[in-house]
């Protein structure tokens, strides 16, 4: 039940937003078209006692109060016309925002690069230490192998066998 109420709320909100957006564009279109048509112009015109026709100024003020005429004329301070000299007071922030963003990113990348370099050097050191430990262990093992091989060679040699046999004869 809660899901359906939530869904209904979103649908109503979406319809409301579309209605507001479409109503805003329709009011601009209606005000533009009413100035061109003769039937609506008659209702906006007032005749004076002398018979001259005076048009109402509410039509022009309504079209100028909407944001569309300012954007079309280019007199807004947020729009940059591409000229070298900038006399707009509010456009300084437009130039500051793109230049500050890459600086922050570069610092973050430098930190990441430094961290990666540190990690790589630490990994190299650890690998070298592991290799050194392996070398030490292997050298110890090699010494033991050599010693055991030497002992085995002595046992296998004829001199050693003769000595052993003589000693065993003497003992009895």
UniProtKB/Swiss-Prot annotation:
Lipoprotein: is it a keyword of this entry?
A: no
Where do the segments described as 3 X 6 AA tandem repeats of S-S-A-D-S-D lie?
27-44
Which residues belong to the signal peptide in this entry?
Answer: 1-22
Provide the free-text tissue specificity comment from this protein's UniProt record: Low expression in first to third instar larvae salivary glands.
Recorded superkingdom: Eukaryota
Q: Does the keyword Repeat apply?
A: yes
| Positions with biased composition (Acidic residues) | 25-45, 78-95
UniProt lists compositionally biased (Low complexity) regions at 55-77
Q: Where is the composition biased (Basic residues)?
A: 104-172
- Which residue ranges does the record annotate as region Disordered? 25-172
The entry's keywords: Repeat, Signal
- The sequence repeats are at 27-32, 33-38, 39-44
Protein name as it appears in the record? Pre-intermoult gene 1 protein
Species for this entry: Drosophila melanogaster (Fruit fly)
């Amino acid at each position: 039940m809660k899901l359906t109420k939530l869904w209904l709320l979103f649908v109503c909100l979406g319809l409301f937003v579309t209605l507001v957006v479409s109503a805003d564009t329709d009011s601009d279109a209606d005000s533009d078209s009413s100035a061109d048509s003769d039937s609506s112009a008659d209702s906006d015109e007032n005749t004076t006692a002398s018979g001259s026709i005076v048009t109402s100024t509410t039509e022009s003020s309504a079209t100028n109060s909407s944001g569309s005429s300012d954007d079309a004329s280019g007199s807004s301070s947020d729009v940059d016309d591409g000229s070298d000299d900038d006399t707009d007071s509010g456009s300084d922030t437009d130039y500051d925002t793109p230049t500050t963003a890459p600086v922050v990113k570069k610092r973050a990348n430098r930190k990441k690069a430094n961290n990666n370099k540190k990690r790589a050097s630490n990994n190299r050191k650890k690998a070298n230490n592991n290799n050194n430990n392996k070398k030490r262990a292997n050298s110890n093992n090699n010494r033991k192998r050599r010693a055991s091989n030497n002992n085995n060679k002595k046992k296998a040699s004829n001199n050693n066998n003769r000595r052993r046999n003589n000693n065993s004869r003497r003992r009895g």
